[in-house]
Amino acid sequence: MSDTASFRDTLEVFENPAPTRNFTIEHHCPEFTSVCPKTGQPDYGTIVFTYVPDRVCVELKSLKMYLQKFRNEGIFYEQVTNRILDDFVAVVQPRKVTVESKWTPRGGLNSNIIVTYPDEA
């Protein structure tokens, strides 16, 4: 697995234009690709970010470049979804965020992984 810091360094932010207001931003990234660590076959999915920014918002080109770094990574659905959330929280520091990965069916099964910050436990 590649170095977490080098992935996080790809993400850029800009100042929240309305930091005193709670508002929701939703980004859909329908061309996500990673590699199944068991089979070596590509996995395709959509990553959806739904977040309430605090001081900053994520810059979209950097988000696209960040997600493209996973293209050749052998990583399970659950692991990549949690890693994306952890990296997003570390850089953007949102008030709250949900990351959902929606995977293209494989072998007659499809998977959706949903992770949130802060934890809703």
UniProtKB/Swiss-Prot annotation:
Keyword match ATP-binding: no
Residues forming the catalytic site: 36 (thioimide intermediate), 43 (proton donor)
Major location (coarse): cytoplasm
Record GO biological process: queuosine biosynthetic process; tRNA modification
Residues binding substrate: 58-60, 77-78
GO CC annotation: cytosol
Entry's Gene Ontology molecular function annotations: preQ1 synthase activity
Disulfide partners: none
Subcellular compartments: Cytoplasm
Pathway(s) annotated for this protein in UniProt: tRNA modification; tRNA-queuosine biosynthesis
EC number(s) stated in the UniProt entry for this protein: 1.7.1.13
Record keywords, A-Z: Cytoplasm, NADP, Oxidoreductase, Queuosine biosynthesis
Pfam family name, one: QueF
Catalytic activity: 7-aminomethyl-7-carbaguanine + 2 NADP(+) = 7-cyano-7-deazaguanine + 2 NADPH + 3 H(+)
Role noted for this protein: Catalyzes the NADPH-dependent reduction of 7-cyano-7-deazaguanine (preQ0) to 7-aminomethyl-7-deazaguanine (preQ1).
Family, per entry: Belongs to the GTP cyclohydrolase I family. QueF type 1 subfamily.
Matching HAMAP family: QueF_type1
Name this protein carries in UniProt: NADPH-dependent 7-cyano-7-deazaguanine reductase
